[in-house]
Amino acid sequence: MKHNRQMPDESLENIKVLLNPKLGKPVKSLTSAQSKACYHTLISNKNLNKTSDEYEKLLANYILLCDEKYLCKTVIPDSRFWAILCDNCQKLRSETLVANLIRIFNVALKCQDSNKNEVIVSICHISRENSQLIGILLQLLSQRPIHIPLFTDTILCITLFLKCSLTLCETSLSHAVEFVPRILILLFQYNFPASMSELLYIEDLQPLILEEFVPLKQRLINFLSSVSIDDYSCSLKADLLTAIKDNSVFQKGLEMEMGDLPSINLLNAYDTFTFLNSPNGSFKRLYTEQLLFGENDFPLYEAIFKLSDQFRRLFNLSGKKENQYSDSERDLKLQIATAVLNRQTCFYKTLELFLRFWIESLAKSQSDLVSLLNLAIITLKYVCLSSSDLEAAIQTKSLLKTQVVALDSMRYKFARTLQLDSIKKEQYRTWSSSIASFDTMLSGQVRDYVRHQRLLQLQKGTWVYAENPLNPEAGTPKVYFLIVSDNHANLLAREFETQTNDLPYLFDNKILTSPGSEALANGRTKVVVLKHITSFKSIELTTPSRRTSSNVYIKLDEANVYTGVELKDRNDRTVLKFYLDTEEGRYIWLDGLKLISPFQHEDISEDTKEQIDTLFDLRKNVQMINLNVRQDIIVPPPEPSDEDEDEEFYNLETLKKVTQNFYFD
């Protein structure tokens, strides 16, 4: 009996020599026989961990030194091993536990034996039976200060764990439908997304998160979307029904809307479950009010299921990105990664936005639901991928906060504006190859129209200063009357001492005035040939600011703004110099002369450019209304041999016809 009691102790001493470098030679990997002996000894002496601090160290060293095949074939599939590791994990240093799990996950992924599926299933079982192991890893990432080597290994370890679950998606669907949702829910429960969002901005951690973890999570999400909840037996369905029953408002909503839970995919179920288990107080209040007082109940579950599918498509990293939302590929990845990592937060906020849109738009039908779904997705796309605030948010490391605030503050009217812009961009993109020639033609037409508009104004004539009105030595500055000739070839100017009561007029290419005002005129009409003007020089002149008198309640700064204009010929000689005293005068005369000039002048004012752009968009939008946007109903052009067939596609001639009999107001 004494000999039998000492055997475990003697065996334990033997493995100390193999596993503890302090007592023997430098540590080497164990052989298969040594691995077997050590494992049996550790299992037999598992209760020693309650009385000795050496046991967990031996266990940790054993995991690192165990023969790879034995570890894969015997140790990992053994539930006793996981129970022992779970009992001792709190005593191990964080670095040691992470290193042990990395070894286990790597060995399992590399396993080529027929029992690989059993090995992977055993690892995924810890999400249910020994979830504190993964919980410790997730909690490590919320600790501060940030220890880069430990955090890098921890993220790698979690990534390997997800890779194990992804392997099940290929080898055992029945197990995958059970464990993949459970693992993602485990990450959600430990607030893992928030921790990763903060670490996303750490330069040393960013590549691992962006290139490894985020795409991996998205692949798991894609898997969930491909499997119906009724195809396999899984606990998620029961958990979802329990979550619905635990909240009377949401249970009533399901009964009124659908009666029973329909056949949905696992991703729909996962998104619904996490939503019901989120802090959704504001949504619940708004939804309850809508059920009580709204005329048309919000179809909550149909909205969740549809939004779930659209959300996945929008942030699908594995798919082709048709649009680039940022000039920087890195910034784009950060934006998508933030949305993928914080899927539940963004999903919840978008669903709340969906509900607000339903109430504000007085929606009531299925077509309204589809329309608002598109509106919500376009809004989400703008907020998460293309908003002008995102660049600053990336710099301040507050991308998620910026996205959440933007969704909370989004207004229905502005969202509809975003939707209109999106529709126009999609239509332009679809027809870009066919419409390029039309754009060139339309641009010329719009510029000609604005040119003609200015010409009509220039032919009415105007008073301008002939001398600098801000020159105190000039006294009362003389003035010019300017007008463009009937043949549009000349700019005519005549100097006057001051403005006349009667507006001068043009006759035979000369500026004339009434006999009573002729005494105020100086000299003859000056003719400036427009084709001789090669450049327009302008400078803004401002009087010193002066305040209103002190006996008024509101004091305003007053300042007069003038524009000095010089018309120069090819030799840089000034052929005419005058001063405009209003913004309107600058807008009409300076831009107008540039537009009617035979030379091309691009330096027109922003107001005129805006007018041209607005008119161009107006004309283009009118003709785009009649064009289909769906690719499947765009008839391709016929082959060159089909000359006798009618043209059933939109080409330049068709686009020209669209704008016939169209006039600007």
From Swiss-Prot:
Q: Where in the cell does this protein reside? A: Cytoplasm; Mitochondrion
The knockout outcome noted for this protein's gene is: Leads to hyper-resistance to cell wall stress agents such as calcofluor white and Congo red.
- Keywords, alphabetical: Cytoplasm, Mitochondrion
Pfam families noted in UniProt:
PH_12 (PF16457)
Which InterPro entries does the protein's record reference?
Answer: PH_domain
* Annotated GO biological process: actin filament organization; autophagy of mitochondrion; intracellular signal transduction
List the GO terms this entry assigns under cellular component, sorted alphabetically.
cytoplasm; mitochondrion; plasma membrane
**Remarks, miscellaneous:** Present with 486 molecules/cell in log phase SD medium.
Function description: Forms a transiant heterodimeric complex with DCK1, that acts as a guanine nucleotide exchange factor (GEF) for the small GTPase RHO5. DCK1, LMO1 and RHO5 relocate to mitochondria upon oxidative stress and trigger cell death. The DCK1/LMO1/RHO5 signaling module mediates mitochondrial turnover under nitrogen starvation conditions via mitophagy. The DCK1/LMO1/RHO5 signaling module also plays a role in cell wall integrity signaling.
Kindly state the subunit structure of this protein.
Forms an active heterodimer with DCK1.
* Name the record gives this protein: ELMO family protein LMO1
